[in-house]
A protein has these predicted regions:
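Bacterial Sec-pathway N-terminal export signals of envelope proteins
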Residues: 18-75, 81-82, 119-120, 134, ...
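Envelope-exposed proteins and targeting segments
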Residues: 25-27, 31, 41, 66-68, ...
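Sec/SRP-type N-terminal targeting helices
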Residues: 46-50, 63-64, 105-112, 121-148, ...
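Periplasmic alpha-helical coiled-coil/stalk elements that build and connect Gram-negative outer-membrane
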Residues: 148-265, 369, 373, 396, ...
Length: 447
């Protein structure tokens, strides 16, 4: 993971920079680029990768209990001691008669230098702990998949909101253009004596309203650009140019068409379900490691070195130990830990069942939204066509002097609403396609 993250961090900014035509020009960003960058470079993904590295390091920590341990040691000691305190209370026969040992012995030096080594010969609990650490690392990798899928979804939705805001800006610009044309038409009609001053006032009011709505739309687009940069983990000041629009293919992914196939794909690919299964597996392995603590542990230990009162006078000494330990009772702490892991497994099983049902519900909901949005698109497109015809016909009536511009203003308002409805329908369809990809567990493949 560390090497992969380093390569991504090295080459991804260069790849993005290559898309920039000139210094200060906006960064051209497609929908697929946004999803790809977010799923590989977003801060949340980097943090998830680091957590995976931490879990892999814990495997090595657990494995250390099964590997040889080697150490070097040396010491110098200068001491005195009371012979009486050690129970040394006897006389030594000499030619001049029995003599007692002096009560104070020393001071004297002691030098010691040696190599210590130990190796577990049988330690099943440590073997089980290594397996548990591996299961936890698998869970961490599954959690990283959840994060990648989530960041891809976040970036996709942020991009959709941005291109929706971009479409709204284009609609409001078109509204302002029409309003300005109507002002010119009203003034011409008034100058020709076939229209009242109120018609000019109404037209100017519509123009001011359209300009105000355009300002709001531009602000929303700027805010949406910031949201996209945050989803990608890049500088919020980065200017972006969105190359995709709310077309019929935006937000597509390679997913099956049939409902049952979609559910099966979700059950097989959804990272949140994989993560839950990994958590249950880790809890089972942890429980197995706890149960293995009841088994005997066999270890061999040895040391070899030199020992003496002086360095030149030191001689070689050694120890060799074969030790077996059998846990008997630890205050029932082990049993309590087992009960905890059993509860964790049962809890995970409940979440797994709920997730399986949620996946089916997500697929059904996304399909309903998609079918509804596609139907809404057809209705919205027809409404937009009729609103444009209504505006054209009302303008002709106003030019001919057979109607006031109130009809034109009403038709213009209808066109504004029709444009918004069309944008909303296309946005809903794209969002439904993204939701369907997320339900199937393939949000990172959106294009």
């Amino acid at each position: 993971m560390g090497v992969r993250a380093s390569l991504v961090a090295l080459f991804l900014p260069a790849a993005l920079a290559a898309q920039t035509p000139a210094a200060g020009a906006p960064l051209r960003l497609s929908f697929a680029d946004a999803v790809r960058v977010a799923s590989s470079e977003a801060p949340a993904v980097a943090l998830a990768g680091l957590r995976t590295d931490e879990a892999d390091a814990r495997i090595r920590q657990a494995r250390a209990a099964l590997l040889p341990a080697l150490s070097l040691g040396g010491s110098w000691l200068n001491r005195t001691f009371n012979s009486k305190s050690l129970g040394i209370d006897f006389s030594i026969p000499t030619a001049s008669g029995p003599q007692s040992l002096p009560e104070l012995i020393g001071p004297f030096h002691l030098f010691d230098a040696r190599v210590n080594a130990s190796q577990a010969l049988f330690d099943w609990s440590s073997v089980a702990r290594v397996r548990a650490a591996r299961a936890q690392a698998d869970g961490s990798r599954a959690e990283r998949g959840v994060t990648v899928e989530g960041t891809a979804l976040t970036a996709a939705l942020a991009y959709l909101r941005a291109v929706r805001a971009q479409a709204v800006v284009a609609a409001r610009q078109a509204d302002s253009t029409i309003a300005a044309e109507l002002v010119g038409l009203a003034e011409a009609q008034k100058a020709a004596g076939v229209s009242a001053a109120i018609d000019v006032t109404r037209a100017r009011t519509q123009l001011v309203t359209a300009e105000g709505l355009l300002l709001v739309a531009r602000n929303q687009l700027d805010r949406a650009r910031i949201d996209v940069t945050r989803a990608l983990g890049i500088d919020p000041a980065t200017p972006l140019a969105f190359t995709d629009t709310l077309a019929a293919t935006l937000g597509a992914a390679d997913v099956p068409a049939a409902r049952d196939s979609l559910v099966a794909a979700g059950l097989g690919k959804r990272p949140d379900l994989r993560a839950e299964l990994a958590r249950a597996g880790a809890a089972r392995q942890t429980g197995a490691a706890i149960r293995a603590e009841r088994l005997p542990r066999l270890e061999v230990a040895a040391d070899y070195g030199v020992n003496g009162r002086t360095v030149p006078g030191a001689i070689a000494t050694r120890d060799l130990t074969l030790q077996v330990s059998v846990p008997i009772l630890d205050g029932f702490r082990r049993e309590a830990r087992l009960s905890e892991q059993d509860a964790v497994v049962r809890e995970s099983q409940v979440r797994e069942r709920d997730l399986r049902q949620q996946i089916a519900a997500d697929v059904d909901g996304a399909l309903l939204d998609l079918h509804s949005a596609e139907a809404q698109q057809a209705v919205a497109a027809e409404r937009l066509r009729l609103a444009a015809d209504e505006l054209s016909q009302s303008r002709e009536r106003f030019k001919a002097g057979v109607a006031g511009n109130i009809e034109v203003i009403d038709a213009q308002s209808n066109l504004i609403r029709a444009r918004d409805t069309d944008i909303d329908a296309r946005f809903a369809a794209a969002t439904a396609r993204v939701s369907l990809a997320r339900a199937a567990g393939v949000a990172r493949t959106l294009h």
